[in-house]
Amino acid sequence: LAAADEILIPLQCEWFGLEGLAKIVRVIEQIREAGANPQITLEGIIMTMYDGRTNLSRQVVEEVSTYFPAQLYNTVIPRSIRIGEAPSHGKTIFEHDPSGNASIAYGNAADEFLTRHKVFAPPATAANVPAADHNDNAAL
């Protein structure tokens, strides 16, 4: 962490996620105070494994938004069995379930990151998209 400029934390919508966040924030403060990297910042927090049907997920998001309103991403990654399935098929979530809620959410999180950093990806053209090696989604 001491070598990083910014920290982006994926945070599970669970109680232990909040405990882990508190520990990471303390470590970031210690790195600053020790002079190892005085400019290190907590760039953002992306809530993951969100299930809007549960009070716990909603409470965790509310707690994070209370203490870290500027860092909390608007995009929330939903709990999805497809995320766990993808690696067992040797695929990314974008290849395994391209139109699923999780794929869309991760794409939105990437867009939000780029927008926060005022970085805009060039439009996909034949010149800057790698050729597909084993399926049509390989360039995603």
Language-model regions, residue ranges each:
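C-terminal boundary of histidine-terminating zinc-finger modules
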Residues: 87-108
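A general structural signal for short secondary-structure boundary/capping elements
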Residues: 35-36, 90-94, 120-124
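C-terminal alpha-helix
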Residues: 108-120
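Conserved catalytic-core segment of NTP-binding enzymes
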Residues: 1-81
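P-loop NTP-binding site
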Residues: 63, 118-140
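Catalytic histidine-centered segment of alpha/beta-hydrolase-like enzymes
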Residues: 83-85
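Short, contiguous clusters of charged residues that form electrostatic/catalytic patches at enzyme active sites
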Residues: 22, 26, 104-111
